[in-house]
Amino acid sequence: MNTLQAIVLAVIEGITEFLPVSSTGHMIIASSFFGIAHEDFTKLFTIVIQLGAILSVVVLYFKRFFQTLDFYFKLLVAFIPAVVLGLLLSDFIDGLLENPVTVAVSLLIGGLILLKVDEWFNNPNAAETSQKITYLQALKIGLFQCIAMIPGVSRSGASIVGGMSQKLSRTTAAEFSFFLAVPTMLGATVKKCYDYYKAGFELSHDQVNILIIGNVVAFIVALLAIKTFISFLTKNGFKVFGYYRIIAGIILLLIHFFIHPLTII
């Protein structure tokens, strides 16, 4: 992987990580289009640059992120299902990650759901602040997030739909999804990095520089993406993301079956 390819992937990570469109699907398309090699460092890169995206949430919501102790316990409750199922289903999930068709189908199904989510969960009494989320609601949102263990589903999409199903407003559901991303993505990143460390994987000086560049780019782009997304949600719904996912899923299937087989990076 060269620096330009790293920047491209980091931009995609920053844009798609917090939008309900699946970062995995976009990484597949980008790696195919730009000829990015399917190698260990590429896999590690796509994991580590999530740290830059995570930092954008902490910076953007700095005051709100450091709220009451009760808020952290709610995040913990929402995070626990991902920890439990992630450990129990690790091998099964890794198997799914090898299949780009799974990603494409997930994009299509998720797109159809997003076309209807505003109609299903249009609640005039929706909670407008994450402080009003109950522990039971937090747990249910965490369970919804686990659906995103299926590649292509989108972690943010699953948790946002989960939040709206619990009578949260669109923006509140999205913001709680951002908060929940911090422990979830941080935990997943640490685990994967530890796995690479145990396997004896070593980084070259150039690779370290590429990781630094990737994180900086992902951080900046994610900041802009989150601000734009929240601003968009205050006036619009999820239909545009639904149509976008359907188009992306169709493109993936067409490329995979009629141009050349795709691989997961």
Swiss-Prot record:
Compartments (UniProt record): Cell inner membrane
MF annotations from Gene Ontology: undecaprenyl-diphosphatase activity
GO CC terms in record: plasma membrane
Annotated membrane topology: Multi-pass membrane protein
Catalysis performed (reactions): di-trans,octa-cis-undecaprenyl diphosphate + H2O = di-trans,octa-cis-undecaprenyl phosphate + phosphate + H(+)
InterPro entries registered for this protein in UniProt: UppP (IPR003824)
Organism domain of life: Bacteria
Spans through the membrane: 18-38, 41-61, 69-89, 95-115, 133-153, 171-191, 210-230, 245-265
Record keywords, A-Z: Antibiotic resistance, Cell inner membrane, Cell membrane, Cell shape, Cell wall biogenesis/degradation, Hydrolase, Membrane, Peptidoglycan synthesis, Transmembrane, Transmembrane helix
Enzyme Commission number(s) of this protein: 3.6.1.27
GO BP annotation list: cell wall organization; peptidoglycan biosynthetic process; regulation of cell shape; response to antibiotic
Signal peptide location: none
HAMAP family the record matches: Undec_diphosphatase
Family per similarity comment: Belongs to the UppP family.
Cited function: Catalyzes the dephosphorylation of undecaprenyl diphosphate (UPP). Confers resistance to bacitracin.
Further facts: Bacitracin is thought to be involved in the inhibition of peptidoglycan synthesis by sequestering undecaprenyl diphosphate, thereby reducing the pool of lipid carrier available.
Identification of the protein by name: Undecaprenyl-diphosphatase
Upper lineage: Bacteria, Pseudomonadati, Bacteroidota, Flavobacteriia, Flavobacteriales
Gene that specifies this protein: uppP
